[in-house]
């Protein structure tokens, strides 16, 4: 019975993916322009340091922006906050926040992102007038289901509001994702469809992204490597990125923090949980300093993290399009509980 349900879920997922893949192409003749919204691609600072390649290797609630199916692999409930300092930081303000809850066989997440820009205005005499504040806002609701201990499926519903001088433009989008462990739990493959929907009353006005990825990540978070390839349709643009993460200084090995958890210390409610939930609660929490490197056809990035048990501080510097004049600095905080 369980095997039949798994096969049915996979068939349903393949059907939905096929419809999404070909729908933009079928309707492309009626679309006047193709473009993307940067706010739809909001991500956490950790993923920025990996040059957007963390599709299969999440560590916090920002997974709701990237790949909801991976929410079920998080070992704790999580809150994540991120701020981006752009080259035009005096006129641009980029922020996102997320929360996730992981249960027995499901997980849920919610994310909010905002992009605010100051636009200077001048009168006929070229005298400066009041600035106009333009904003993009995103609300992202994600959910995931664990088919079995190696397969996960997830989806998102996203709403976008573009506000400019009291004028609003609305959009609605759908994401779907699937990931699976192969050979051993540390090696994963996955596929996702992002940003399928409408914007300003036009279907497929925004590119739909098709994502494929393969990654290897050690359970103790000391090492991870990921390769991701994206294609956007119907504009047919490509993105490939490779990310590497490694522990530089391990506080646990130095004896600075004791992250070991004994069954005797756990409440009975945890001991009554299924074995995979017990494994999550018993997972040794990383503590230390991690370094990251990401490179792809869209640029290069470097990142650092300070892990202390349930707290993590992230930093990333991103050279978009390999341009020294287009450098962004990202700062992030994560809390698990």
Can you say where each PLM-predicted feature lies in the sequence?
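N-terminal secretory signal peptides that target proteins for export/translocation
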Residues: 1-10
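Subset of outer-membrane beta-barrel
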Residues: 29-337
